[in-house]
Amino acid sequence: MTEMSEPTIRLATPDDAPALLAIYEPYVLETAITCEYKVPSVEEFAGRIAKTLERYPYLVMEFDGRAVGYAYVSPLNSREAYDWSVETSIYLSRDVRHGGLGRKLHDALKQCLIAMGITNMCALIAVPHDEDDEYLTHNSQDFHAHMGYRLVGAFDRCA
């Protein structure tokens, strides 16, 4: 990626599954943040994208035609009163983190949600109990705090 290039953000399609799964896989295999133990198949991942797109935006960020991140939302709760609240998910390729791209992707997702009348974005994130370790860091917590999220609750010592 060159200094002059700007990322593009577009709506994902199920055809993006292989590229987005390549971004997601290291998070499943090398961290504790996804709460998944097994990497989904490309077919399953494509199905997840399609299911999300039935109701919500699923965005992909590209640099020079290469997917470098994605963001989507899912229902926070199945009850009707929660229809205006969503859970956000955002993933970036490890080689582009900490460069402001997460903010751009998050802001694009937020604008889509505002246009839909969705007023409450929540992030359920895993954080280490004390110090960072090889599987879990405070990066997501710090990012979300920087984006204006605030801690409203914690599940302590649960799996």
Label each region the model flagged.
Residues Y72-P75, L124-A126, D132-D133, Q141, ...:
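Conserved catalytic-core motifs of GNAT/GCN5-like acyltransferases
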Residues T8-L20:
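A short beta-loop-alpha structural element at the N-terminal edge
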Residues K38-D95, H106-D107, C112, M116:
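Acetyl-CoA-dependent GNAT
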